[in-house]
């Protein structure tokens, strides 16, 4: 029998959620590479206000398995606030940001399909992390649309804060 894998859902607006209510269990041991039998970091994290359909979840989990990231992958379903020209910014959930991203404003390098974009990671309200400058160009250059899914993989051992972005087009599910 496959061991349960915990997929963390987290708030993106600074609200606090108990660890029990912020975790979903799925029975797919192939995602869990932890041989110790104890809890480990979830393989991916989805903001609590986002919900993956069954077909989206299946595709995301296959992609996560293929990526084999050391840190959990942050999953974002593109909403109007991320892609509409007048708003274009991307928020990282508070819990993901606190656990995996530095707590200071700086440049974040995004890599996608062999190209790079420098974006500005900014902090609002003391703890909310957003990508701004450079994010609109990333959106445009990659043809991101409402409903597309981006998987943000934190790259270790880079001289600059870097994330590889894997895009799943809405037509794939």
Label every PLM stretch briefly.
Residues 1-130, 136-173:
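Intrinsically disordered, low-complexity regulatory/interaction regions
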């Amino acid at each position: 029998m496959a061991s349960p894998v915990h997929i963390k859902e987290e708030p993106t607006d600074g609200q606090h959620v108990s660890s029990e209510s912020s975790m979903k269990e799925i029975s797919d041991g192939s995602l869990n590479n932890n041989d110790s039998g104890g809890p480990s970091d979830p393989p991916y994290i989805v903001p609590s206000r986002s919900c993956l359909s069954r077909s989206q979840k299946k595709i995301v989990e296959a992609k996560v398995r293929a990526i084999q990231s050391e840190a959990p992958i942050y999953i974002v379903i593109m909403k109007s606030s991320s892609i509409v020209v007048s708003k274009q910014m991307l928020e990282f959930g508070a819990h993901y940001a606190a656990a995996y991203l530095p707590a200071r404003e700086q440049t974040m390098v995004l890599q996608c399909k062999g190209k790079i974009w420098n974006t500005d990671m900014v902090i609002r309200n003391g703890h909310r992390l957003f990508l701004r400058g450079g994010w609109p160009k990333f959106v445009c250059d990659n043809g991101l649309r409402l409903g597309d899914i981006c998987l943000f993989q934190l790259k270790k051992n880079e001289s600059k804060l870097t994330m590889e972005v894997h895009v799943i087009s809405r037509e794939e599910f």
